[in-house]
Amino acid sequence: MKKTLQDEIEAILRKRIMVLDGGMGTMIQRYKLSEEHFQGQEFKDHSRPLKGNNDILSITQPDIIYQIHKEYLLAGADIIETNTFSSTSIAQADYGLEHLAYRMNKCSADVARKAAEEITLQTGVKRFVAGALGPTNKTLSVSPSVERPDYRNITFDELVDAYQEQAKGLLDGRVDILLIETIFDTANAKAALFAIQNLFEENYAPPRPIFISGTIVDKSGRTLSGQTGEAFVTSVSHSDPLCIGLNCSLGAAEMRPFIETIGKCTTAYVLCYPNAGLPNTFGDYDETPSTMATHLKDFAVDGLVNIVGGCCGSTPDHIREIAEAVKKCKPRVPPASVFEGHMLLSGLEPFRIGPYTNFVNIGERCNVAGSRKFAKLIMAGNYEEALSIAKAQVEMGAQVLDINMDDGMLDGPSAMTRFCNSIASEPDIAKVPLCIDSSNFAVIEAGLKCCQGKCIVNSISLKEGEGDFLEKARKIKKFGAAVVVMAFDEEGQATETDVKVNVCTRAYHLLVDKVGFNPNDIIFDPNILTIGTGMEEHNLYAINFIHATRVIKETLPGVRISGGLSNLSFSFRGMEAIREAMHGVFLYHAIKFGMDMGIVNAGNLPVYDAIHKDLLQLCEDLIWNKDSEATEKLLRYAQTHGTGGKKVIQTDEWRNGSIEERLEYALVKGIEKHIVEDTEEARLNGEKYPRPLNIIEGPLMNGMKVVGDLFGAGKMFLPQVIKSARVMKKAVGHLIPFMEKEREEARLINGSVEEEDPYQGTIVLATVKGDVHDIGKNIVGVVLACNNFRVIDLGVMTPCDKILQAALDHKADIIGLSGLITPSLDEMIFVAKEMERLAIKIPLLIGGATTSRTHTAVKIAPRYSAPVIHVLDASKSVVVCSQLLDENLRDDYFEEILEEYEDIRQDHYESLKERKYVPLSQARKHGFHIDWLSEPHPVKPTFIGTQVFEDYNLQKLVDYIDWKPFFDVWQLRGKYPNRGFPKIFNDKAVGEEARKVYNDAQNMLNILISQKKLQARGVVGFWPAQSVQDDIHLYAEGVVPQAAEPIATFYGLRQQAEKDSSSTDPYHCLSDFIAPLHSGVCDYLGLFAVACFGVEELSKTYEDDGDDYSSIMVKALGDRLAEAFAEELHERVRRELWAYSRSEQLGVPDLRRLRYEGIRPAPGYPSQPDHTEKLTMWRLASIEQATGIRLTESLAMAPASAVSGLYFSNVKAKYFAVGKISKDQTEDYALRKNMPVAEVEKWLGPILGYDTD
């Protein structure tokens, strides 16, 4: 018999470790290809840019791809991957090339085949080509819309079609292997496997070996769609891959534990091709070839791998060293079997059912035929509340969820799809496998197409004959599901023991012998039928099931037995206590005889021994048919003892606790409802709490200590802490009048009264002079107050003398300074100097978005001899303050900080010596150059001058809100892959709290908009503009720029940090994107300023009411609305007001990804770090007079919820960071701006590449 490719490759894998190639994209980047290279001759007139579409290079630059393949092969790669990572019609649609998908794959395979055959001939060592199928840019498991968790922008069938087209091109190009790689969503991979199987069934025999490679996105060990490594393997192993493993996302060192997991749960060979380490701050990969090779050699020595290679950042040099490192290592020996005798299922997590697994509860309540509540919710389209039923089933112990949508009034496939998709958005539910239950096979298929895990299908039978049975079974196997087979054949439902056994035996052999089903994936349901009906022929139904179960388990190895338990007691509808007892007794016996699982109401099964003895005996008699009057006796029992109903859960049970327990519970849970009456109850207990202060120092502070401990341990999140603080304030607010009365009485008696301080310490907080941003500071204040610190919050724009005087007046233990804009850094230095001069030797904390440990260590700490500490966020503030005020820890902590900051300073000054800068003249010479005469002429705006927008419609802005920064305010940060919005809702740690805060935000937004609490105002302006070197001159309308004086000038800063010797990247300046004065091309520049008014006032109202949560919420939403205003207005500028991109049709996600033409950089940000450029904007457009947005002395905008910037329309304009500059540019810039060099250095401090001290 002729050897297949699989035989050939497997023979090599048994002998040695094979080597895969490295990063294709990494190598392509080295060629620094232009748009013209990507287009080639064929696509030079293509309507969309193609740069970045690496896969098209197999058509337009095949010689480059061929050369890269050769480099990897000569470096020692046994297997090269085709350049087809994004060669599906789905991914290519972004470039308008979806019609080329087949050709792209065929060409890529041809190029790789040519290289492999040439090197095989040259070296005498057989080389192989793996056809790469990437994950596409869409996902079946995650909704792109937070408002619609059930929505998907791609279907399983569409993915199958796309993958089938791709695989066909690869197979026609003669690839040896099909490699489904970088799998972040297992559902997508299952669609690829389905497509490949379609081709193998049609006309591509013999099948090619399949390699499968997933992607674990971080140290949590899960894919982007949430699956663990073992669950992923379980979900795709039905395809019988030759190799399975991991690639991308992680470096080798980080990937090791997950490769070990993969190896323990598969009989396939294991492949591993990690990135060259983790990306650095610039997104590049730094791990050297020798380091990467050392890590992978360790894998090999420990017997973990069969194939190794590289992904992102890896090069032929990496592959050469890896090949050499593993050359003499023995390959991993795959185990003959894993989890022998187990049924393997998966949701987001694996679920193994083995010989010693306890009875498996399949939750029954998500069934429109079995739960009236569930049916009502589904009929009403209330899928969100229907999910709560599923979640409750899991919480009550369901290990699998049965989903059934069989109702004549429902569109079954649609309802099943919608509900399964909704489940995928809830990790607490999606962690368990699903049992897709329907009598309509189209509904079953709809459910299977939504599930990334390995499901159970419930059910198929021989009712329609063998042909129908085999067809459905083959399709189920192709989906990778386990199957429930009913004891039902062409003659009807089996009721007798021998008939049940015969039907199941026949089905077993058809499944195992003809379809190739793993016996461990077969579940038989021998029919639990209703007893106690009064019909004699039904009396043996329970006994027949139990006896059939025993025989089936003894004669059909590997199978499991299940059944629908509620059928048993259907005669006793409405008598819940009777039904539950019957179920408990039946299961007690059926499990002993071999029943493995059942569809039950999880959590409602009584323990056999806990059933009342009289009821127990009656159930025993009925089930075992011991008493012909058992049914009547049970009915009489029900009449005597009551039918039994659902238990009522006491939701306010905590109200029965002691007053101390109630106060603590209210604080921890943030419940305001009873806090005043409970506080008053404590106050009236004069024996226990003789003074109101005793209540604050006692139960209230104890409760807040619990809150602080939970927050510090990561078990409470910031929004919850702030709600706790609101409750605390309300309690203290109730006690204050009584405390004041007590003090007044003491003063009358004693003439004076000594003030008592119950706090851990006093801290003065302030946003420094010239800065109006205070959300972060307010949050720190709330968190510190929750941890028994007395917080003196001085607000925003606080002068140094006021800060220091407050510290003296309140006998502060610590001062905390906050700031958002770069000029605030200088004010912080000034405060530190003044503290040193006035000998106020208390710790100084530094925080805020613009601050850093480096700036604190280098610029602030040397000015002050007491502790100066940079605090990252609110969660760190408590620890820092506690250590600074603890006499036992303070000195050691300060010493540690001193040493750490000294190291930072040394590193900083060493880095200044190492940094190299090109002279300004050279940077200008190598700036970004545009051929203005060959480019389309700039579009003239629809008006010159300004247009003011009064009372802008806030409702229009809501869809443009970017929610990620909103969650950052609340310090709710999901772990990868759940960092962004709406993925954060899927995060196991913060997802639930994030959703609560988001819902609160939605409610607040409705109030703000409907009640007109806030007002949005803005201004836009356009002027003729020309560049002169690094500056942009603006002119009045109608003049000839070459013969006129500019009405304003915006000064630019140019990149100077020396670039890599091989780099052709230009040294950017914003002026590069405006036509030069001498070009003869008329160009234009725009500007804008927008703000939300009323935020501070409304926030202050909430704060005065003791509602810190709403106070911070208003500010956070004010900032988001201002940013949304800027986004929405920029869209209008592009399409209407400037109209240089009239046909733009972009969704909000595209706007977020900056897929539009033009940019809107802001002074004070990386592309122009100088805040003083705002002065020109405000003067030119009369911004303060037009809108009310003013500039502070530090050039922060007031109100704080404000955004401003410039508009550039050129299609080649892009955002960049100026980075550090050298002194020659500072001096030149000062000369052009007619400012003293020292003044310019003050404003540009953070970007100076030299020390000014």
From Swiss-Prot:
Q: How does it assemble?
A: Monomer. Dimer. Forms a multiprotein complex with MMACHC, MMADHC and MTRR.
**Descriptive protein name:** Methionine synthase
Task: Please name the PROSITE patterns in this protein's record.
Answer: ADOMET_ACTIVATION (PS50974), B12_BINDING (PS51332), B12_BINDING_NTER (PS51337), HCY (PS50970), PTERIN_BINDING (PS50972)
Needs which cofactor? methylcob(III)alamin; Zn(2+)
Per UniProt, what is the name of the gene that codes for the protein in this document?
Mtr
Q: Which Pfam families match?
A: B12-binding, B12-binding_2, Met_synt_B12, Pterin_bind, S-methyl_trans
**Which residues are in the B12-binding N-terminal domain?**
650-747
Q: In which pathway does it act?
A: Amino-acid biosynthesis; L-methionine biosynthesis via de novo pathway; L-methionine from L-homocysteine (MetH route): step 1/1
